Each structure stands twice: as C-alpha cells, then as structure tokens.
C-alpha cells in the first residue's frame, strides 16, 4: 500500500505541481509543504467516496463471494503491479496515469480470476457505472479541462493582461478567483459528505448558501490581507503569483481527493476481508487512518522521488507563466473535484496536460509541444 501511494506521489503528484515549479510560483520544497497539508486534507475529506469506487466499481465483488481469499490476494497483486509500474515509469521519466494503472490492474486481476464476468463493464448507478465510465473519462476529462482552462485564460488575458491597467485588474480578479475556488471545494465537501453520512441532513439548497457564505468570507479576508501587501509591488506577475499559489493549494486538495483512492481502494478491500472473512459489499466504510496513510505516502513520494519528472511536464509541454499556470491548475482542480464528486476516477496528469494544451493554443499551434501530447496519449493506452 505504501509503495503504491509512494509511486503516485513521485509520478502523478509531481506532474500536478509541474506548472507551479516551472513558473517559479513555488520552489520544490515549498511544493512539498503545500502537498503535505492539502493532499492530506483532500484525502481525508473527499477520498472516501472515490476509494469505495475503485474498490468495488471495477471488479465485481459478487464473483468472489465463494472465495474471498482470491479477491484479497488479487488486490495485493493489484497494489504490487501498480506500485512497480508507477515507480519504474518515474525512473524512466515517463509520465503515466496512476488512475489508469490501478484500474487496468483491477481489470486484469478480475479477468485472470473469473473471466469477463468478474468485471463490471457497465451498471445503472448515480455515480460510477462500472469500467465503461473509466473509458468515458478519457474523453470527458480532457474536454472539461480544455474548456475550463481555455475559458479562464481567455478571460484573464482579455480583461487583465491586455487591459490599460493590468495590475489593478489583477487585484480585482484575485478575490473573484478565490471565491470561485472556495465555493467549488466547500460545496463538493458537503455533497460528498452526504454520501459518507457526515452531512446527511444538509439539502442541496442549504449546501449552496453555506458554500457561498464561506467563499465570500475567505475571499474578503484574502483581499483585506493580500491586496494592501501586493499594492507595494509594481509587477502584474507578482499579483498573479499569489493566485497561482492559491490554485496550487486547490490542485493539491483535488489530487488528494481523487488519487488517494488508487492506492487505498485495493487495500481497503484487503483490510475488510482480513477482518470479516467475507467479500465487501458496494458500500463499506473506509477507516480514516487508511486515507491518512495514503496521503502521507503520496507526499513522501513527491518529496523524495518526484524530482525525476517534476519539470518534465511544466518545462516541455507549453510556455508556463504565472497567469497560464493559474488557469491550468484551477481548471484541473475543478475537473478533478467534479469527477471526485460523482465518483469518476480520472487521471490528474492527463487532465493537467490537456488543460495546458488549451492555454498553449492561444499562442498558435506552435505554442504546444504536440509530440509530448502524443506521448501522453500513447502512455495512457500502454499503462492500461
């Protein structure tokens, strides 16, 4: 379990922070500190819903009811295979999706155990409807990421960067960006809590106004604290740098919510079978210590091995500035949090790459390293 979460931190999380480090909004050690705090929070607050998805949404537990020990050892093989590929690909400086690694290992284990009947290809559900939704995510997550990042960068470039007084505009944009980001996070936490029975009495309308109030409070507080400080600076990039740091925090939170499931899902099944000697159902509570342990492993992976590919994404895909990095990170976070809310396991790395593609296209087709995009797509299929 620790080895798999370690590989996720070294490969996937390093890609997530590539924009911040490449744009010099964060130094490497600062990125590690940000990840240590917000990765942990995302894993604990939102990780439970997605962990349940990866545990029982790909391999059909009913196929293993007569032999629960097969599922337990199968999940152990899934963790070993995923950990090996994540760390090995990181050594080769190959950017891969840890989500696809775990999902592919789960499907392979199920097929090897009981054939195609042991795989949930499609199911009627309000969240993750079987393995087919994973393939659907290959198309929907890039589209959503490109839409969000393209829209954000268009607005920033048109109304801030190319205005007569870009610095003043940047100061006005910061509270709005903070409000939008906090609203998305708070609303998602409450909605996910409904599924985990921690906010089960909160209606959707109540969740909206709670999110609005919290977002307004934090955005106003940030404006009162940071705007007077930033007025002493003379460069627009200084104001944008603070926005990118905030978006990096959001990105880390979203990554913890989405990717902790990859490592903890199989282990949660192993732990349940070991305790109860039976196959877990579709809804089994995941102990908080499992989520926390996964978050710790991811952070350690970034701190000790993430340097292998930290700059691979940010420096070679598109030209990265603070404004571009902010739009890429915020768009990726919005896409990943949306997916975590509905229990759809998507790739943070690939989402981030396609968000960068949309931003790079504003500089023309030469503004994107299309070879790297093709390499990312090929790695997606090879990994699965």
Where are these regions (language model features)?
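Alpha-helical transmembrane segments and immediately membrane-proximal extracytoplasmic
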Residues: 1-384
């Amino acid at each position: 379990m620790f080895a798999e979460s370690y590989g996720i931190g070294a490969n996937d999380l390093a890609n997530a922070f590539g924009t911040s480090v490449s744009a010099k909004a964060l130094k490497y050690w600062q990125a590690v500190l940000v990840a240590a705090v917000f990765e942990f929070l995302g894993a604990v607050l939102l990780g439970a819903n997605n962990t349940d998805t990866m545990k029982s949404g790909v391999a059909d537990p009913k196929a293993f009811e007569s032999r629960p020990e097969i599922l337990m050892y199968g999940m152990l093989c899934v963790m070993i295979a995923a950990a090996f590929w994540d760390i090995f690909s990181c050594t080769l400086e190959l950017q891969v999706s840890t989500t696809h690694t775990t999902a592919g290992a789960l499907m392979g284990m199920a097929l090897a155990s009981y054939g195609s009947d042991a795989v949930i290809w499609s199911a009627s559900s309000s969240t993750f409807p079987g393995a087919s939704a994973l393939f659907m995510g290959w198309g929907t997550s890039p589209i959503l990421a490109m839409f969000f990042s393209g829209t954000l960068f268009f607005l920033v470039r048109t109304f801030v960067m190319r205005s007569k007084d870009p610095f003043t505009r940047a100061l006005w944009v910061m509270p709005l960006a903070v409000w939008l980001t906090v609203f998305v996070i708070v609303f998602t936490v409450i909605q996910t809590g409904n599924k985990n029975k921690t906010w089960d009495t909160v209606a959707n309308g109540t969740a909206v106004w709670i999110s609005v109030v919290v977002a307004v409070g934090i955005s106003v507080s940030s404006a009162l604290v940071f705007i007077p400080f930033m007025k002493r600076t003379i460069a627009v990039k200084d104001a944008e740098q603070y926005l990118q740091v905030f978006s990096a925090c959001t990105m880390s939170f979203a990554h913890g919510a989405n990717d902790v499931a990859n490592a903890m899902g199989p282990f949660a099944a192993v732990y349940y079978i070991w305790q109860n000697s039976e196959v877990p159902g579709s809804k089994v509570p995941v102990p908080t210590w499992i989520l926390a342990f996964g978050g710790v492993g991811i952070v350690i992976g970034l701190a000790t091995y993430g340097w292998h590919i930290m700059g691979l994404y940010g420096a070679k895909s598109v030209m990265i500035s603070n404004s571009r990095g902010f739009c890429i990170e915020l768009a990726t976070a919005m896409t990943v949090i949306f997916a975590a809310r509905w229990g759809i396991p998507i790739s943070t790395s690939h989402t981030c790459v396609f968000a960068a593609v949309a931003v790079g296209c504003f500089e023309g087709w030469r503004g994107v390293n299309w070879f790297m995009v093709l390499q990312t797509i090929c790695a997606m299929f090879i990994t699965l």
